[in-house]
Structures are given as structure tokens and as C-alpha cells.
Design a protein with these regions (language model features):
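Soluble ligand-binding/transfer domains with enclosed cavities or grooves
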Residues: 1-122
């Protein structure tokens, strides 16, 4: 996944220089992501100030619908993503990183667990 340089640069600048990035970059809404080994899944992102939380609308054998899949800070792009064994056993959060390619494309990388790219679902 290759970021679009101009979009990435302007979005990063807006996030870094805004007092509240929520007025500059709003990621709220439904996003579609392909979780490797599963299928396309829909997540709903809510945003409060500089914090975003993604909750699964459609789930899988590991993290079901209604559960948080990741949360992150727009200021640092650091966050944590939820992982679990099949049937949602032993769920836990691991460190992760949010990446913003454009207003319509983001990704989240779970430490040692892979990356999911999301596209805005209009």
C-alpha cells in the first residue's frame, strides 16, 4: 500500500498543526477492511477529539461484531488493536499503529499480527 504523497503530507500537516484534529480530519463512519484469512468486514469508526475507536459491524471467528477492533490517537497515530483466539477466547489488546493514506483510505497495523487496509464506505 503506497501512500499518496500530496494527500498524506497535507493530512499529516493538518493533524500536526491543528489544535483539534477533529475539525480537520474526521474519520467517523463506516469503513470496509479485508482481514486476511477471512473476508471483507465493516467497521464503524467513532471519533472524539483526537481519539478514534473502530468497532466491528461484521465480525469473524476471532473478534465478533460489536467488539472494538482497534483504537488510536490521531496526534501520535499510536494505538492498540484487539486480537483473540477462535470463538473470542483470551481477547487482549496489542500495540498498533494507524496510517492515513487519504481521507478515503487508512490502515491499522497490529504489532506482530499484520495490517488491514480500510476504505471509506460511502
Amino acid at each position: 500500500m503506497k501512500p499518496v504523497a500530496n494527500s498524506q503530507s497535507s493530512i499529516n500537516n493538518a493533524v500536526q498543526h491543528a489544535g483539534s484534529s477533529s475539525s480537520v480530519l474526521d474519520l467517523s463512519g463506516e469503513w470496509i477492511g479485508y482481514y486476511r484469512g477471512h473476508y471483507d468486514q465493516v467497521v464503524r469508526i467513532t471519533q472524539s477529539g483526537d481519539e478514534v475507536v473502530a468497532v466491528k459491524v461484521t465480525g469473524d471467528d476471532h473478534v465478533p461484531a460489536g467488539e472494538v477492533t482497534f483504537r488510536a490517537s490521531l496526534k501520535t497515530l499510536s494505538g492498540e488493536g484487539q486480537v483473540a483466539e477462535k470463538e473470542f477466547r483470551n481477547p487482549c489488546f496489542v500495540p498498533g499503529k494507524l496510517a492515513i493514506m487519504s481521507r478515503e483510505r487508512i490502515s491499522f497495523s497490529w504489532e506482530n499480527c499484520g495490517t488491514v487496509e480500510f476504505r471509506k464506505d460511502d
